[in-house]
A protein has these predicted regions:
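Active-site region of glycoside hydrolase catalytic domains
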Residues: 31, 198, 294-454, 470-471, ...
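Lectin-like carbohydrate-binding module/patch detector with strong preference for beta-trefoil
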Residues: 60-199
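Cleavable N-terminal signal peptides of Sec/SRP-targeted secreted and luminal proteins
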Residues: 8-25
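Extracellular low-complexity, O-glycosylation-prone Ser/Thr/Pro/Gly-rich "stalks"
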Residues: 27-28, 51-63, 189-193, 494-506
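Aromatic-rich peripheral "rim/lid" segments of glycoside hydrolase catalytic domains that contact
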Residues: 458-506
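Active-site mouth of glycoside hydrolases
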Residues: 32-36, 41-66, 199-372, 383-384
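Short, solvent-exposed loop/turn elements at domain surfaces
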Residues: 43-50, 78, 408-411
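N-terminal secretory signal peptides that target proteins for export/translocation
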Residues: 1-6
Length: 506
């Protein structure tokens, strides 16, 4: 027995040393630039990448942040929060834009708050006002909560039941009150409204709050455990991909009990990514994709309703998320970089706030590691792509992250195959060389893809487009990252592109 356990100790010592030397061999073997892929829609939900994940949500078209417009069928006029909010709500507009658009906050599958353009909520104002509807409260409570009652034949015919049990009615075009007891669905009924959905969000907030506290935890954990597995790292490493960029949300730092509706357990999933990366000799870039307050208003920033509110007041909390991630993963030889904030959007995120945050986030990483690179994402929107260069040059082991899509702008709308490829070889090549200075930070094309606005392109067209991008983005000194690994839309999926011979890296 004794000698047997002695042997076990000796044996485990040898296995241990072997593992250690292997991990040193791997880390010393590691060279830039990286060929990476984004594990998008894994730990930060993006509904468009796999819409079926939302299928089990009741009233799944009425999620947080859904933008709705309401037209009185009797008056044929839209509801409007006068001045965008802060005063009365009327029903006198013949067309609808920002003041006539309300963002839903979902309480449960049938109860909602309505947030107006200036961020107030509309609700009943009863003091001497006869339950008049006003958009004056900056918080949502009992008086701001309404049940959306949908017509069973036409779900876009609705009546809004207030917390006094009565319905909102458009008595006249300037008088909207919550005092109607009728129940007809006639056009002439003053409580019937046509609901038009003009915008949707499908991010982490929407899926977790949509399923609700009873169902969301199991659904999210099943997703984390099945969407990305050991096999995926095996597939990637054997196909020439040597790193993964893993988008995470701020709530991971509150694991295992993040504030509702977010669900605990995502840090366990990220731990697994490190285990698999280690096993297959790959590197991990942790990417804070969703900051509290939302740095860009997109669903992939974890936003509840699409308002972009990240700024100075959120910096301490955001730095503590970086601190959590750096503390937890700094010792892993697979950690190659931490990206402090994905796609901050100008002008809502100012350059001053961003540099202030980047400086503090950088220091948080350096508390735990001198080796990991710190990645600074350039701002999207109207911003100079070189605005971070001198700042980043003053710090060691930093990287500027740029995202290149021939999409999301009218200028790409009518480009044909060759024009798209020329754009890569000319404009993208020079944009990239502008951020690749000799003594400054490294450069990373952290997101790109082979999707474009060309209709009916052939496989060969896609292959040429992919090859052009690999050639040009291959000049980025830190590397590139395909968006994404898995996606319901094939050309956005590096897995599909490799399996079908559209992209070859080895
Ligand atoms: C080091 O890199 C070489 C060439 O890319 C590769 O063949 C080898 O397997 C790598 N070794 C380790 C330990 O990863
Ligand atoms: C709608 O009603 C409000 C309140 O009476 C008024 O100030 C506004 O001018 C009206 N707008 C239109 C387009 O009639
Ligand atoms: C939904 O929320 C409302 C308002 O808080 C509550 O009265 C109602 O019971 C809830 N319904 C369900 C099904 O939880």
């Amino acid at each position: 027995m004794a000698s047997n356990s002695y042997m076990k100790v000796v044996l485990s010592f040898f296995i241990f040393s072997f593992v250690i030397s292997l991990s040193f061999a791997q880390s010393s073997n590691f060279t830039l630039p990286l060929k990476s892929v984004n594990l998008g829609n894994w730990l930060v939900t993006e509904g468009w990448m796999k819409p079926s994940r939302f299928d089990g949500i009741p009233n799944k078209d009425l999620l947080d942040g859904t933008k709705v417009q309401l037209m009185s069928t009797k008056l044929q006029k839209y509801l409007c929060a006068e001045n965008g909010g802060g005063t009365i709500v009327v029903a006198n507009r013949s067309s609808a834009s920002a003041w006539e658009t309300f963002r839903l906050w979902r309480i449960n599958e049938t109860f909602f708050n309505f947030r107006v353009n200036n961020k107030q909520f509309f609700g009943r104002f009863s003091q001497g006002q006869g339950n008049r509807i006003v958009a004056a409260s900056t918080t949502a409570g009992y008086a701001q909560t309404f049940e959306i009652v949908r017509n069973s034949d036409d779900p876009n015919r609705v009546r809004l039941k207030a917390s006094n049990g009565l319905f909102i009615q458009a008595v006249s075009d300037t008088s909207l009150t919550a005092d109607y007891g009728g129940s007809s669905w006639d056009d002439s009924d003053p409580s019937v409204f046509k609901l038009q959905i003009v915008g949707t969000l499908q991010g982490e907030y929407q899926i977790t709050n949509g399923y609700g506290p009873d169902k969301a935890p199991q659904i999210m954990r099943d997703h984390w455990n099945s969407y990305i597995t050991d096999d995926d790292f095996k597939f990637l490493s054997s196909n020439g991909v040597n790193a993964v960029r893993v988008p995470v949300g701020w709530w991971i730092a509150k694991d295992p009990s993040p504030p509702k509706p977010f669900v605990g357990g995502s840090s366990q999933a990220l731990d697994n990514a490190f285990i698999w990366a280690q096993k297959y000799g790959m590197k991990v870039i942790i990417d804070l994709h969703a900051a509290q307050g939302s740095q860009n208003g997109n669903d992939h920033s974890g936003a509840r309703d699409g308002f972009q509110e990240w700024g100075d007041s959120y910096i301490p909390d955001t730095v503590s998320v970086i601190d959590y991630l750096a503390a937890r993963y700094a010792k892993s030889s697979s950690l190659v970089a931490i990206a402090l904030l994905n796609e901050p959007l100008a002008p809502g995120v100012t350059l001053d706030s961003l540099k202030n945050y980047y400086q503090q986030g950088y220091s948080a990483v350096r508390k735990y590691t001198q080796n990991a690179y710190v990645i600074f994402s350039n701002r999207l929107g109207p911003a100079d792509s070189k605005e971070l260069l001198s700042f980043a040059s003053s710090l060691s082991r930093t990287v500027i992250d740029v995202h290149y899509y021939n999409l999301f702008s009218d200028s790409f709308k009518n480009l044909n195959v060759q024009q798209n490829i020329d754009y890569i070889n000319n404009q993208r090549a020079s944009a990239l060389s502008a951020v690749a200075t000799s003594n400054g930070p490294l450069s990373y094309v952290g997101e790109w893809t082979c999707e474009w606005n060309v209709n009916g392109a052939s496989k060969e067209d896609y292959q040429r487009f992919g090859k052009a991008q690999l050639d040009v983005y291959g000049r980025a000194t830190f590397g590139w990252g395909y968006w994404a690994y898995k996606c319901a839309q094939n050309h956005w999926s590096l897995k599909w592109m490799i399996e079908n011979g559209y992209i070859t890296l080895v």
